[in-house]
Amino acid sequence: MRGTQDAIANGDTRTITIRHMHTKEETTVTFKRDGRYVSEGLEKLNWALRDWRTDEPIRMDPRLFDVAWEVQRTVGSEQPFHVVSAYRSPGTNSMLRRRSRAVAKHSQHMLGKAMDFYLPDTPTARI
């Protein structure tokens, strides 16, 4: 990923704020410092983005946070990410699949590679 390589080369420090819409928790985390991922920050994000139905976290793909940070920077938003869905345990995913055809059987949410969010000050079409 070119953006990740640029971050290391530039020595970026990246901080994001997550507001989970189901748990109502808000967390501000520095996940990258001097172009390197910060383990403590990633652990906090893993917990903040856990399956809220089971309180089960997973190791989220840290590149997901790079993409989210880039989106926020590109659109110029200063609002927290309002997270609707992040990690889903296989059991939660199965339950949601029974309720909706829109839930993928092999959802990236189960792998820690997806996060559904919106930025309150940015039209979704712009994201």
PLM-predicted stretches and their roles:
Residues 1-10:
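N-terminal twin-arginine translocation
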Residues 8, 14-127:
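Cell-envelope/glycan interface and biosynthesis
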